[in-house]
């Protein structure tokens, strides 16, 4: 369709309609003295702003390149756009609610119900068109997800040599040359190979890196199961725009109902206001409540993503228990799990592991645990520990091997020493306010003894037995021997 895609053309068409009806409803609301029509016109304005924000955020988020200024790209632009739309709509609803309450205290009649009815019906039609357009966009987004899943499955089958008609099977038996040469002209597999050549080139580097890191793709060769287990990725940006359109549609319904009542049961100018005058503000308050009930969950979800909170559906306690039960792991700390965007979860963690054992097997098992939890972007930092050291030295199991080299930057750490989150340690028990590691089994990996403790360790007399603070000289000398979790 030339410069713009079909979806962009539909959105631009919706923008034009929204601008036109915003002006029409604003003028008609003042002429007809209808608070519902005025509120609906400002809902149209919010739709216009949300469309601009949604289009801009979607364009920014689709930028394919990552640079030194945006190492994660611009994927969160849609999250910011959705949050902006939801917050703006909430503020608008508050303004409308205040105006409706004032109208309840001083009710007024609708002067020209016929004009209000005509404009309200036309506005409702525009909103229905908008709902159909954005529902189509949401369906297009879901279709893209399903298409990606099918392409993953086709590439996996192609790698295993089990694509029908490409490396054997009934179609291959009909033409041996095509079976021998899957890239022969006219063969079905030739189209598949050409269609996926670019994507296979992009995945080549990741495949080599994963093989070097010791990952096993045999445990992740079921894309359909993977798509079912991971959290469903929703288009937050589209949800924000849909929320505005839905609110505007509800406002149009209120306008139509109020106008019909005044048109069927007109009030003369000399008659006092009766129950009819309360219909308009009452339905407006109900509309505000319905819109806010949909806006608050979107605000909560987008704010949780921007605050990098643990995603909903991730059981941290169960995950930590499984990680600490992996053979060879002495302790797990510095665990951070957050969402880049809805459905894309990222995890980082530090692992204490024996220095005389290779960590490839443990890395594979850890990634399997995260994979089954729906987390596929995992960064693991292994830290060596010598289990042959005396028991009094095993407090080192609780220490991070990579603290900052300077005490002055302690407050700049994501988890400063004063804030002690929970860590999992195999064979660790809490003793006198601090952990003790004298309860190891024969292999040091007894899962029954594993406990979740808040860790504050003392090393080389950095802290007294009663937790008394030290003077500045002693604290400076032993800072390099303490850390945070």
UniProtKB/Swiss-Prot annotation:
Role, per record: Calcium:manganese antiporter of the plasma membrane mediating the efflux of intracellular manganese coupled to an active extracellular calcium exchange. Required for intracellular manganese homeostasis, an essential cation for the function of several enzymes, including some crucially important for the metabolism of neurotransmitters and other neuronal metabolic pathways. Manganese can also be cytotoxic and induce oxidative stress, mitochondrial dysfunction and apoptosis.
Entry keyword annotation includes Manganese: yes
Reported impact of residue 47 to E: Loss of calcium:manganese antiporter activity
Consequence of changing residue 4 to F: Decreased interaction with SLC30A3. No effect on self-association. Decreased zinc ion transmembrane transporter activity. Decreased EGF-induced ERK1/2 phosphorylation
Alphabetical keyword list: Antiport, Cell membrane, Disease variant, Dystonia, Endosome, Golgi apparatus, Ion transport, Manganese, Membrane, Neurodegeneration, Parkinsonism, Transmembrane, Transmembrane helix, Transport, Zinc, Zinc transport
Transmembrane segments: 11-31, 41-61, 82-102, 114-134, 245-265, 279-299
Assembly description: Forms homodimers. Forms heterodimers and high-molecular weight oligomers with SLC30A3, SLC30A2 and SLC30A4; heterodimerization is mediated by covalent-bound tyrosine residues, occurs probably in a tissue-specific manner and could mediate the intracellular zinc transport activity into early endosomes and recycling endosomes.
Cellular component terms per the entry's GO annotation: early endosome; early endosome membrane; Golgi apparatus; Golgi membrane; membrane; plasma membrane; recycling endosome; recycling endosome membrane
Annotated site residue numbers, Important for coupling of manganese to calcium transport: 43
Protein name: Calcium/manganese antiporter SLC30A10
Highest taxon of source: Eukaryota
Disulfides per UniProt: none
Ranges in the topological domain labelled Cytoplasmic: 1-10, 62-81, 135-244, 300-485
Compartment(s) where it occurs, according to its Swiss-Prot or TrEMBL record: Cell membrane; Golgi apparatus membrane; Recycling endosome membrane; Early endosome membrane
Tissue specificity remark: Specifically expressed in fetal liver and fetal brain. Expressed in adult tissues with relative levels small intestine > liver > testes > brain > ovary > colon > cervix > prostate > placenta. Expressed in liver and neurons of the nervous system (at protein level).
Swiss-Prot/TrEMBL induction comment: Down-regulated by zinc. Down-regulated by angiotensin-2. Up-regulated by manganese.
Clinical condition linked: Hypermanganesemia with dystonia 1: A metabolic autosomal recessive disorder characterized by dystonia, parkinsonism, extrapyramidal signs, severe hypermanganesemia, polycythemia, and chronic hepatic disease, including steatosis and cirrhosis.
Catalytically driven reaction(s): Mn(2+)(out) + Ca(2+)(in) = Mn(2+)(in) + Ca(2+)(out); Zn(2+)(in) = Zn(2+)(out)
Listed result of changing residue 242 to F: Loss of calcium:manganese antiporter activity and increased zinc ion transmembrane transporter activity
Topological domain ranges for the Extracellular compartment: 32-40, 103-113, 266-278
Main location: membrane
Any one of the GO BP annotations: positive regulation of ERK1 and ERK2 cascade
GO molecular function per UniProt: calcium:manganese antiporter activity; manganese ion transmembrane transporter activity; zinc ion transmembrane transporter activity
Lineage, highest ranks first: Eukaryota, Metazoa, Chordata, Craniata, Vertebrata
UniProt effect for mutating residue 248 to A: No effect on localization to the plasma membrane. Loss of manganese ion export across plasma membrane
Similarity comment: family membership: Belongs to the cation diffusion facilitator (CDF) transporter (TC 2.A.4) family. SLC30A subfamily.
